[in-house]
Amino acid sequence: MRRKTEIYSVELNGTKDVELADQKDDKKFKGGKNKDSEPNKSQEEELKKELDLDDHRLSNTDLEQKYGTNIIQGLSSIRAAELLARDGPNALTPPKQTPEIIKFLKQMVGGFSILLWIGAALCWIAYVIQYVSSTASLDNVYLGAILVLVVILTGIFAYYQEAKSTNIMASFSKMIPQQALVIRDAEKKIIPAEQLVVGDVVEIKGGDQIPADIRLVFSQGCKVDNSSLTGESEPQARSTEFTHENPLETKNIGFYSTTCLEGTATGIVINTGDRTIIGRIASLASGVGSEKTPIAIEIEHFVHIVAAVAVSVGVIFFITAVCMKYYVLDAIIFLISIIVANVPEGLLATVTVTLSLTAKRMAKKNCLVKNLEAVETLGSTSIICSDKTGTLTQNRMTVAHLWFDNQIFVADTSENQTKQAFDQSSGTWASLSKIITLCNRAEFRPGQESVPIMKRVVVGDASETALLKFSEVILGDVMDIRKRNHKVAEIPFNSTNKFQLSIHETEDPNDKRFLMVMKGAPERILEKCSTIMINGQEQPLDKSSADAFHTAYMELGGLGERVLGFCHLYLPADKFPQSYTFDVDSINFPTSNLCFVGLLSMIDPPRSTVPDAVSKCRSAGIKVIMVTGDHPITAKAIAKSVGIISANNETVEDIAKRRNIAVEQVNKREAKAAVVTGMELKDMTPEQLDELLINYQEIVFARTSPQQKLIIVEGCQRQDAVVAVTGDGVNDSPALKKADIGIAMGIAGSDAAKNAADMVLLDDNFASIVTGVEEGRLIFDNLKKTIAYTLTKNIAELCPFLIYIVAGLPLPIGTITILFIDLGTDIIPSIALAYEKAESDIMNRKPRHKKKDRLVNKQLAIYSYLHIGLMQALGGFLVYFTVYAQQGFWPTSLINLRVSWETDDINDLEDSYGQEWTRYQRKYLEWTGSTAFFVAIMVQQIADLIIRKTRRNSIFQQGLFRNKVIWVGIISQIIVALVLSYGLGSVTALSFTMLRAQYWFVAVPHAILIWVYDEMRKLFIRLYPGSWWDKNMYY
């Protein structure tokens, strides 16, 4: 009687069955997120159905009957075509792509762009109002058109940058369509894998990618790499046996997109496309919504501030103008002019270029940014949830320790392994190295003689590859050694025997004996031995030798390393002459009373750059959490070696071991670090997970499933953390998408992971993330400096309008002139600040709090507007009044002169000396005053640019000339001003005139005052950290 089908969750690394009944509270873990951020209920139910499997329990006959197929003959072509039409192609549905036009339009209307569109609309409204009242000037039409042009050009630039990253992403995709060897109509055929259907009989061999979910009906030495599902690369044996109730853990199922490492197998396709396990996880990722980036939130916040300031000031002065008996239409024009004067027209272009420059800089450092705004998000990161394999480690098994002659020796685990320091003169090492070399099926692919050993491609599993490369580095040409010691018989490793054995002729022409070499699980190998080799001599395997073995085995195993035992036996020539035929099925040779030679342990070692990178994270206040599918002991060992768990910090288990008491007796609060398994996490409530994340600074999650990685990310986000997640497998894609910034691996990463991520590490190196964090913090700092620089002149541009309205002076500076400041003299200097090097404390600060540490905070606004801004305005008016006074108009005579000044019919207006001025002469003087005001702002902006190089350090600590682009910006300011004044001074439509040389220097004392004032501000901040001055003057 067939058992009732059970439904299992994708707990891929768990050690026990996990029923979905236990996962009903999944939503509780989601932290109350909005509906868009998780799959809807019907979708979840559908995803559950996809795992409604009992195929692993069925006999071959039942399986043939269920799918209407035949193991020998396969499906008929006609039936296959029917199934293909019914189920669709065997491919994952690609993620929904945003149409290019929508991407382009988003660039046109996001953030600053809205402000500029409103500004342009207001300019045109002002022109219409003036036109109706018959006083129309084309200035506002030009201004509106230029604002629209700025939006379009910066939008095109941002779209181009994003499209470039998208194209690089597309190039990751496999260009060659995958093929599958299928039996149809009793013939073997090679067809595109997309055309496979359920019931097809497929054959796979070492090196092939499994083309669909298959139930194995034949297997010979088949091992698969499930890393695209589990994230871990330990080879998994595959057979035809039903070994586990959970279909995800039984050995007779092969999963779509996993790789067959060695051996051969035949299987019946049981799921295709989106119905495969990989398809299910990809569907889970597509249901997870992306959150707004922190920089997008900050820009939105800044737009609100600027809009609020602009509208508030505009309305106040609109009311003032009406109260002062101005015409309502004039008051509306004033309102619009004040709002437009507050809009930082050049800032949109500056921010876009700054993000692009940083993205390019990061690409050079192996970080490909898909979304420009993700650059800054990385800088805000407060928690990094990092995968272990390939990110923190080198993604290759490496020999770490050896034990022979009763000693543990340390092997070189660096990238090239050229510094092996252990004793190689011992006779025991000679025997051990021979076993390591001969008892190994891995081989180098031919034609790689010129490639460094550690980079050569090997056919074989991860452990065998490690042993092969280790032998090649120390002994030389392994393939030549094997030729000289010809293999005559072999028993491959299997999970039942837990050993691998081979028999060889020896290279010594005088020794006619066969050499049998064996490796495997240390306890199994020791059972087969009666002697042990010490210093090249065989000795009886007594209790003291066995105890020494167990001590070494426990020590190496406790380091999280995979330990193998090695032994050999010379077969006597009289019983086993050279003509002897060895039978590996009936085993007609001894497999006991062997000589134990030594132990060897392997680990996927940490990358050499990771400990320093983790240390930098700790200095920067970033918590690094390891999330892996690997064994807790291995995970903890790697965490300790890279500094995720500090040398002095203990887990509950460490304290229990040290005190020799049960784990339950230890007060959890005593432990500073925690290692949590997937099974423990499954039983935690969200509140317990929150408590864990709050109370422990050093955490390792081991044996976790894809859903659990998602739960961990959401738990971190509940603590108001900005979370970065690394991953490479399809299993990681839901968490990558949910994180504030998802980081996929460029080399080992699956396409699904790269699609879900915001950034791709081209070198798969954790240290590149830390580089990215520094770049992200730097861009936030530099954007702050850019905004502070840009906002400062707003007051100097706004005050002339206010004085014009309130005091009735001739207009000190016009809207077109303001535009030349915002888009002419200030653009290149603003961009130059993006090249500014980091201040010394950038990686010693805590991560910024996304709700408290704003891009534009109160301190920045007050300092820019009311401190430096007012100084600039005073400097501008000083030059303005100097120009008018030298021409005969004393400052007092200009008050309430506006109406007479602007009346076209008055051509005999008297100045303070009784001289008469025509309308044209007055207009020319107004242009001169406006040009002088423009130059005054430009001169003071040079000082403002220099002081913005730092926020805390002195300019002299930072270096005046380290950022050469700043000086390019300063020179560009001066050149633009010179061209406008002397080159285009005769073009009356631009409102510029040729200035006397003396007017260029009137504002210089104000520029020096700005510099000195800011240096004093920074000095007091450094001298009195935490004081009122620090809290209110550091922006």
Swiss-Prot record:
Domain of life per record: Eukaryota
Residues exposed to the Cytoplasmic side: 1-99, 164-299, 350-783, 835-854, 950-963, 1019-1035
Reported tissue expression: Found in skin, kidney and distal colon.
Entry annotation: catalytic residues: D387
Group of enzyme by EC: translocase
Transmembrane segments: 100-120, 143-163, 300-319, 332-349, 784-803, 814-834, 855-877, 930-949, 964-982, 998-1018
Gene Ontology, cellular component aspect: actin cytoskeleton; apical plasma membrane; basolateral plasma membrane; cytosol
Protein name, per record: Potassium-transporting ATPase alpha chain 2
Organism whose genome encodes this protein: Mus musculus (Mouse)
Upper lineage: Eukaryota, Metazoa, Chordata, Craniata, Vertebrata
The gene coding this protein: Atp12a
